[in-house]
Amino acid sequence: MNPSQILENLKKELNENEYENYLSNLKFNEKQSKADLLVFNAPNELMAKFIQTKYGKKIAHFYEVQSGNKAIINIQAQSAKQSNKSTKIDIAHIKAQSTILNPSFTFDSFVVGDSNKYAYGACKAITHKDKLGKLYNPIFVYGPTGLGKTHLLQAVGNASLEMGKKVIYATSENFINDFTSNLKNGSLDKFHEKYRNCDVLLIDDVQFLGKTDKIQEEFFFIFNEIKNNDGQIIMTSDNPPNMLKGITERLKSRFAHGIIADITPPQLDTKIAIIRKKCEFNDINLSNDIINYIATSLGDNIREIEGIIISLNAYATILGQEITLELAKSVMKDHIKEKKENITIDDILSLVCKEFNIKPSDVKSNKKTQNIVTARRIVIYLARALTALTMPQLANYFEMKDHTAISHNVKKITEMIENDASLKAKIEELKNKILVKSQS
C-alpha cells in the first residue's frame, strides 16, 4: 500500500470534521521515510504534536492492518525551524528507544528563566564533548507537571543522538510494561540487553517505579550497570528523591548521588517568553494583548498553554477569522472558569497571611497598619484575578461599605505594582503558588 493512501482510507474510520480539521492537513514525506518509518508533515509543530499524540498509534495500526507491515509513525512540522540533523537520525537509534524523541524538544527551543536555569545548565553541560557520564551523573530533575521536565530530558536525548550515542528514553510506564511483557514471554535477556547496553538512559516520571519491589530491583541493577560503564542517567519526577513514596532507600540514595535540580513555576516574563517562542516556532501571530491575556489568565502548565494556542489557531483557520482578544477570551472562558472554581478567597487569604506573618482576622478587619493594608490589597487583587467573585461579594467578605471600596483598593495596589518591581514579583510568586496548589 502506498503510505499516502493510508490517510484517505482512514477517512472512513473518522467523522468528517475530525478528518478535515486534522488528518487532511498531513502530507506524506517520502524523502525522509523508510521501510519501517513513515514520516508525515503537518502545517506546524503544535498540530504535529497533537496529531502524533491523538492519531499516531491509530495510523500505525491501520497501516499494519491494511498492508501487513509494521512501521513507526512520525508526525513532524513541515515548517519546523530545526536543523537537518534532527531529521537524519539513524533508524536503529529510533528503534532502540521505548518512545520516539520529539525532534522539536531541543535546548534551542527551551526558554530559560530563573525558574529552570539550574536544571537547564546541568543538562546542557553534559552534552558537551566527553562530558556524558562523567560530569554530572545522575541528574535528577523534579517539579510540578507541565513545566518542561520532559522537554529538557528529550533535549539531552536529541543532542546525544546527534553525537552518535545510543539513547533509551522511557516513561516509568514504558519501563514497567517492557519488563512485564518480557517476563511473561520468557525473554528477560532481551529486556536487559535493551536497557543495560545504552550510552544514555532517560527515565520520565521515575516516581511511578514504586509499584513493586521486583521492578525496583531490576531498575537498581540497570542503574548500577549503566553508571559503572560511564553511561549517563537522567530522571524526572514530581518530587525530590527523599520525598518519593514507595521507592526503596537504596534507589533514593542512587538518585541523590549526583545533581538534583528543581524546576519551579515560571515568573510572568518567562511565561510570556515561552508563549512567544511557541508562536514563533509555529508561525502563529498573536498580539501582545492576547499573549499577556494567556499568560495572566492560565496556570503554568506549558502543555495547557500549547493547547490553548492550538485551539486559537484552529478556530482562526477553520472559521477564517483573525485571532483577536475577543476570540481568545471566548475560547478560554470555560477553561478559566474551571480554574477559578477550584480557587477560593479563603485559600488566597491563608497564603498571603502566611507570607506576611499576619492573622487573617487582621486582614479582614478595618485596621490601617501599612503591612496589613498591603496584605489586604494583595488578597483583593488576587481574588479579582483568580476567582469569580464580584466586587460586591468581595466588599461583603471584607465587611466594607460597598464595592467602591474594593475598586479603590484594586486601583491602589495596581499603582503600587507598576512602581515596585519587588512587589510585582512577590505577587506573581503568590499567584503561581495558588495556581499550582489548585491543580494538585
Curated annotation (Swiss-Prot):
SUPFAM superfamilies: P-loop containing nucleoside triphosphate hydrolases (SSF52540), TrpR-like (SSF48295)
Domain of life: Bacteria
Region described as Domain I, interacts with DnaA modulators: 1-74
Region (Domain II): 74-99
Binding site for ATP: G146, G148, K149, T150
Pfam families hit by this protein: Bac_DnaA, Bac_DnaA_C, DnaA_N
GO biological process: DNA replication initiation; regulation of DNA replication
Protein's cellular compartments: Cytoplasm
Cited SMART domains: AAA (SM00382), Bac_DnaA_C (SM00760)
Record region (Domain IV, binds dsDNA): 317-440
Function: Plays an essential role in the initiation and regulation of chromosomal replication. ATP-DnaA binds to the origin of replication (oriC) to initiate formation of the DNA replication initiation complex once per cell cycle. Binds the DnaA box (a 9 base pair repeat at the origin) and separates the double-stranded (ds)DNA. Forms a right-handed helical filament on oriC DNA; dsDNA binds to the exterior of the filament while single-stranded (ss)DNA is stabiized in the filament's interior.
Family: Belongs to the DnaA family.
Record text about domains: Domain I is involved in oligomerization and binding regulators, domain II is flexibile and of varying length in different bacteria, domain III forms the AAA+ region, while domain IV binds dsDNA.
Full protein name: Chromosomal replication initiator protein DnaA
Species this chain originates from: Campylobacter jejuni subsp. jejuni serotype O:23/36 (strain 81-176)
Gene: dnaA
